[in-house]
């Protein structure tokens, strides 16, 4: 469908140049319009098929402007430690916990994919942070 996708090329500090396909299914935090030169964090499904080409090309799942915030996308155990053991949430999000459509989320994070927005974290393992905002994706 012509016009329904956006091809985006970014220069990553870790991976060099990377191409992303942005579709109507891509969640863009705060529905922000992206511009050339924006500092972004892009999450993609590492288990999804991808062509073996250079530069690598992935389908973007979540995109966030990241000039002032850091982001983590993943699942959490009931002790608020991420399932990969890299991040621990201390306390509730300052701005709240929401669904992608902006409605308040009142359930438990366990077993759900969550996008955590934060400004600082400790250098411990796992890193600890008090999130600014949490967006919970309830997949069926």
Question: Regions from the language model: what does each represent?
Answer:
Residues 9-22, 84-95:
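Short, basic/aromatic beta-hairpin or loop at an interaction surface
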Residues 16-32, 95-103:
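A cross-kingdom feature marking solvent-exposed beta-strand/loop segments within repeated
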Residues 1-9, 29-89, 101-140:
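Short, flexible, surface-exposed loop segments at domain boundaries
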């Amino acid at each position: 469908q012509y016009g329904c996708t956006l091809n985006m090329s970014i220069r990553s500090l870790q991976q060099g140049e990377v191409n992303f396909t942005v579709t109507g299914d891509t969640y863009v935090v705060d529905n922000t319009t992206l511009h050339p030169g924006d500092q972004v964090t892009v999450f993609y499904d590492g288990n999804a098929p991808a062509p073996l080409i250079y530069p690598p090309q992935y389908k973007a799942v979540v995109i966030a402007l990241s000039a002032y915030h850091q982001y983590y996308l993943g699942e959490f155990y009931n002790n608020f430690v991420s399932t990969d053991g890299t991040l621990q949430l201390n306390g509730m999000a300052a701005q709240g916990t929401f669904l992608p459509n902006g409605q308040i989320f009142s359930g438990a994070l366990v077993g759900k994919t969550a996008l955590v927005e934060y400004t600082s974290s400790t250098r411990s393992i796992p890193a600890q942070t008090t999130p600014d905002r949490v967006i919970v994706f309830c997949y069926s």
